[in-house]
């Protein structure tokens, strides 16, 4: 099986899954969070060292206040309920995005999770929350300018991103039958292979992950070369 160093996933379709099952959007998002718990051991078994999950975009702030508040609460509950298990399983946690927009108590909770797991090396789980890739690049450039740089290189931008250690994305999976990348890791996914699934995220299972990876393994990556 072809080695994947960085798998990124746009976990789309929670609300439509809920509609399909006559459930509330909140129940759909809860099912989506439960799916992360279910699939994480498989990511570890597959020896994929870096996983990035798109959980809440910068554009999602425009949704109803009730949905936004629930998604924020869901992140807090996930960290509260899963942190010990993640730590015991050697998972290193990173959260990227404009986290300054979150309440201070959640920022503290995120920082505590990052600090607790900082020396773990089994797998790095990066949660993209309040995240937009254009915003990340703007923030990186602003940081570079503030440091007095006049000539900017790709290396400068890479080191000013939310996670400078993040490797380029090898495979980007999007569930939910939508064919776009929605302002997600535009810099890091410049040469990523894209895989789109019709399944809604709560219906995803390890066989779907294997199917995506198998499809990826059949592709020839040229990176612009012949």
From Swiss-Prot:
SUPFAM superfamilies named in the record: Undecaprenyl diphosphate synthase (SSF64005)
InterPro entries: UPP_synth-like, UPP_synth-like_CS, UPP_synth-like_sf
PROSITE patterns assigned: UPP_SYNTHASE (PS01066)
List of residues binding substrate: 13-17, 25, 29, 57-59, 61, 63, 174, 180-182
Co-factor remark: Binds 2 magnesium ions per subunit.
Keyword vocabulary terms for this entry: Magnesium, Metal-binding, Transferase
Positions annotated to bind Mg(2+): 12, 193
GO molecular function: ditrans,polycis-polyprenyl diphosphate synthase [(2E,6E)-farnesyl diphosphate specific] activity; magnesium ion binding
Residues annotated as catalytic: 12, 60 (proton acceptor)
GO biological process, one term: polyprenol biosynthetic process
Gene3D superfamilies hit by this protein: Decaprenyl diphosphate synthase-like
Enzyme class: transferase
Record has Zinc-finger as a keyword: no
Pfam families in the cross-refs: Prenyltransf
Family: Belongs to the UPP synthase family.
Subunit structure: Homodimer.
Function as written in the Swiss-Prot or TrEMBL entry: Catalyzes the condensation of isopentenyl diphosphate (IPP) with allylic pyrophosphates generating different type of terpenoids.
NCBIfam families: uppS (TIGR00055)
Designated name of the protein: Isoprenyl transferase
Organism: Rickettsia typhi (strain ATCC VR-144 / Wilmington)
